[in-house]
């Protein structure tokens, strides 16, 4: 067992990380620690900066306020033109994304059989795994009201969310509608960037962590 920070050992350990982001995190974290302890004990080696190259800076995500989410849902409920089902469809979709942290792809792939008394069964997620996402009683009630009107429709698809033509909603349609909702809700740009749909997922994650100590367990179930 090594007593001092060793650059070669750090590089080997960081290289074993499952992703490039985690590799950089491991390397930079130990590197900062080494800078601190090296002042008192020079036998701690100082790893060279950016050994794995300069990490690409990610855009800082927007965290929506509760009021902004309310305004998005209200704007959805007031959608006009097209299918008269559109307002309830998008109000329910936005509410569900905000309440569960689902990816938009996961929400759009939901089928009747995925809505269970225990929550939403998310099949073959981004990492090809399935998980059960619990629903708060208010979210379950809202989804139930939507399904009460959706199920009787004599359509060929059993997807939960459908477009004006009775087909599963496409990504492009959702993003166009969301941009429209964000403008109607008067949500401002942030650091030059317009509001994004995926930031509802970031918002859910942050709110869940703020609800500690139960937050970490809750976010794990949803993500």
PLM region descriptions:
Residues 1-223:
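Conserved catalytic core of the tyrosine transesterase superfamily
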